[in-house]
Every structure is written in structure tokens, then in C-alpha cells.
Amino acid sequence: MRPIDDSSLTWDDGALVTVDQRGLPHEARPLRLRTADQIIDAIKTLAIRGAPAIGIAGAFAVVLATRAHTRDGIVDVAAVRAEADRIAAARPTAVNLAWAVDRVRPRIAEGADAVLAETLDMLAEDGRVNRAAATHAADLVQRLCGPRPLRVLTHCNTGRLATSAFGTAIGALRVLAERGAVEEVLVDETRPLLQGARLTTWELAEAGIPHRLTIDSAAAWAMATGLVDCVLVGADRVTARGDVANKIGTYAVALAAHRHGIPFVVVAPESTRDPATASWRDIVVEERAAEEVTAFAGSATAPVGTAAFNPAFDVTPADLVTAVVTEHGVVHGTVAAEPGARIAATARELYARGWMPGTAGNLSVRTGDTAVVTASGLAKGELSATDMVRVAIADSTPLPGQDRRPSAETTIHTAVYRATGAAAVVHVHSPFATALATRAGAADEVRVLRITDYELIKGLGGSDPTAIDLAIFPNWRDVPRIAADIERRLAEHPGAPPVLCIAGHGITTWGENLTQARDRAECLEAVCELVLRTGREHAFAPQTHVLEMGPT
């Protein structure tokens, strides 16, 4: 039996080497896959399965496709891209497959070695990411359930077979077991393909974690009779609002956990989160062959010709999920994420849009008479929940005993908090709003631009849904001076909209929570883009005089 820390996917002499999961637990058949078609077939037939694992396997398939379409050192880029599309479509529900293929696409023109280097980096990252997510999840479970040996129910398979190393939900079980905090794991068999019975029990036995197997339909009764303290599962896709697509049967487990007040915790890498998918209704749920239901171990269990409903996945609504935990900590769930986790997740989203390039920009959340704000000098695309500073709203000073330091722009946040009832502030450098502010602003005075008759104005939080007076502040080198200007104007104009611009600098928005503040930043950027794209020029006046700008 292989050591559990071994990777389930390796690259050897031009081939992807793995174990055929269809043979487990009785036979660990090695697979040596040398073509993209072989990998696609392995993914479709579940020889390779698990969202992170099929993502990495898909990237290796692009490596092999690039090799196959290279002649005399020249890559047929169009042919490889077409192959990449086919690879990404092999299983539609798990977002990791398309994510991994998209990650290596930009390297195709550089040749197979470049695609391979990116894929090997991804493979190395997977173990680190899984271990981090598993540790965060174990910490959360112990916080929710207490420091005692726990009885945990899990569904499907989420170990190194489903990833490449360590595992997600099984990884969390391993961390808990290392802490002496596992009494027993109850494993759903996971019909119809028995990933729990065949794979999870095999991995738990390998790790020496005590467990029992149960039929899927007994999970709710196990909860009702007090045999379960917590549920830990993985995910194939997490929507923008926190809905979770996972192996069929997960939704039923979540419903039972909700009914009995048992924490339902999802453990998955960030690559499983899909901000482009708004809700569960947008997820394509794969349906598989009827024979998986109408037969068992090769023998028919239903009359010939019996029709079957055989979805491979279901989607658990966000309100049934206690927490979605990634390598960055809690990012979704009914359990309130710590401010740092929420801020870090939002910062990564805004970084991906190009609004917080490098170390620029900052976000904050009010916590009583203090605020939690992103620390200075850190790349916003890599923030974690601990990359924050708590400051006093009264004077912007950091509370003692912290390693991180706040940036000078923290004074803008605290100025907004002192002058308004805001609970969160977003300060970013979105391009269209910054460009408009640069054109409209002045070096030494606040200017106001009236924008009218754009539908998105209603998303800016002003009192008039058809018009907004957008204040544009001068960009003083001394940032506290900008903050003083902002606080003074907000005090003088208590009905001012919760958005503003700083010439040549960026935008600041605020709201009742971080989501609302972020949404207002999105709407402001969109409105400013519309204004600029109309191509109309105006002279801009100081704050005592307002000029109008609206659609012609």
C-alpha cells in the first residue's frame, strides 16, 4: 500500500501516472496515460475523479496535446486550443477542470515544456493548498464543536485520490486525528458508484482513522440518534453566493444536518469557487448512464429497459451551509466569517478585476469603535485573514500588539466611519472612475460632477435614483489631508451619496456591509465608464457649481 503522503498524480517520462480508482479498494491498478484522449477517457469513466484531481489531470492532457501538435519545434496553437476546449468539457459540473485548463492556455504558444512547467507548479501547489484548507477547517470544527473527540459524517471521497495530495475534507479529518480529536468517522457509501465505500474507507484505513461505513439513507437517522457531531464534505463548484455543487446525496445530508442543528462544513480549494456562477440554477449538473443505477457489480438489479434518473451531483443552497472553508479560511457560510476572512476574499476578487493592482487599495470593516483594515505593503491578490490591522476609528492608530501596519489611506476609512454610519469601506483604483476623476478633478479644490439618467445610478445609494452629485477630491500628497477634506464635506453634506472619487487616485465607497460597499464600487465604475464612452466633454466647476452629465 502506498504511503498516504504520496501524490496520486505524477508525471513520468512523458506520461501521466495514476491509480485507476475504478479498481479500488481491491486492486490498485496503475494507469499510464500518454495521450490527451486517454486522459479524457479516464476522467469521463471516473478512473480519475475528484474536482481538484481532474483539474490537474486536464492540465496534463493539454501538455500531451501540445506535444502531439508540435512539428519541428512549431506548435499548432489553434489545434491545441481546440483540444483544450474538448478537455475542459469532459465533465461540466466541476469548475476545477476548466480552471486548470484555462490556467495553462496562455503557455501553449511557448511550447509543451512551458505548459508542463505550469502544470507541475499547479501540482505542487495542490498539496500545500489542501493542507492549509484542511487546517482552517479543523480549527473551525473544533471552535464549533468543542475540544473533544468528535464523531464526523462524510460523503463521497475527498482525500488524496480526489485531489493530488492530502485531501480537503479528509485532509481536515487527518488534521483532527493528529490532534486526537476524532472518535469516529461515519462514511456514507455514496450511491451509485460507492466512492465512500470503495475509496474513503480505503484512505481512512490507510491513515489509521477509526471509521464505520453506512448506507446513504441512514445518514439522517444517525444524526437524529446523536451519532454525528459535524458533517465534513468537499465540493465540485461553489457559486458566488455560496451554493455548493457536490456529489449527489450531499443536499440530503445538508438538510438533515440543518434539521438537527449539526454543523455542515465544506472544504475546498479556492479554485473550486466560481464567482462567475451566480446561483445553483446556473450550474450544469451532469447526468450519467442508467446502468449505474439499474445494475450493481455487473449484475442487473432492475428489469431490462427500466428508465433511471441518475444525476452525478446536486447543489446545496448557501443557507444550509455552515461554512465553506478554503486555503484562505472561511469564505462563505451561515457562520459569520471573521472580518479578516471576508475582507481577504473581497480583496482577491477586486484584485482579479485589476482594481487593486500590486499592493494598492484597501478595504475595511467597522467593529465597534475600531475597524479591521488591510495591512500596508501586501499584495492584495494574496491576502489571508491574518493580513489585517485593527485600528482605532477615533485617530487611525493601530491597536497594540500587532505585527502588521496600516497604510496612510487608513485615515480615509476612519474619516468615513466618523462622519457616517458606514459599516464597511472600499478604496480601490478602478480605471474608468479614476480616469473620469482625473479629467474632472482639480489640484486644489473639491469639484462636483452631476451625472444623470443612467440606470445604474440607483445602485450608488443616493437619495435620487436618476442623478448623483459625485464629489471629486484633490489628490494631496499628504493622505490625511485628503481624509480631512472628505470628513469635512461629509459633515457639511450629510445627505451626500456614499461614493466619491479622488483625482488621479481612485474611488472610495461605503455601505451597511462589505458586500454593499463593493457593489457600490462596481456601480460607480460602470457609471463612469458609460460617461467616458459617450465621448462628451464638459468643463468642470468647483463644488459651489454643478454641471450636468447624462446620456444624450
Curated annotation (Swiss-Prot):
Pathway: Amino-acid biosynthesis; L-methionine biosynthesis via salvage pathway; L-methionine from S-methyl-5-thio-alpha-D-ribose 1-phosphate: step 1/6; Amino-acid biosynthesis; L-methionine biosynthesis via salvage pathway; L-methionine from S-methyl-5-thio-alpha-D-ribose 1-phosphate: step 2/6. Keywords: Amino-acid biosynthesis, Isomerase, Lyase, Metal-binding, Methionine biosynthesis, Multifunctional enzyme, Zinc. Coiled coil: none annotated. GO terms for biological process: L-methionine salvage from methylthioadenosine. Binds 1 zinc ion per subunit. The record marks 156 as: Transition state stabilizer. Its EC number is 5.3.1.23, 4.2.1.109. Residues 1-333 are annotated as: Methylthioribose-1-phosphate isomerase activity. It catalyses: 5-(methylsulfanyl)-alpha-D-ribose 1-phosphate = 5-(methylsulfanyl)-D-ribulose 1-phosphate; 5-(methylsulfanyl)-D-ribulose 1-phosphate = 5-methylsulfanyl-2,3-dioxopentyl phosphate + H2O. GO terms for molecular function: methylthioribulose 1-phosphate dehydratase activity; S-methyl-5-thioribose-1-phosphate isomerase activity; zinc ion binding. Zn(2+) binds at residues 427, 429. The active site is at residue 236. Residues 334-535 are annotated as: Methylthioribulose-1-phosphate dehydratase activity. It comes from the Bacteria. Its cofactor is Zn(2+). Transmembrane segments: none annotated. Disulfide bonds: none annotated. Substrate binds at residues 49-51, 91, 195, 246-247. InterPro entries: Aldolase_II/adducin_N, Aldolase_II/adducin_N_sf, IF-2B-related, IF-M1Pi, IF_2B-like_C, Initiation_fac_2B_a/b/d, M1Pi_N, MethylthioRu-1-P_deHdtase_MtnB. GO terms for cellular component: cytoplasm. Pfam families: Aldolase_II, IF-2B. This is Probable bifunctional methylthioribose-1-phosphate isomerase/methylthioribulose-1-phosphate dehydratase. It comes from Nocardia farcinica (strain IFM 10152).
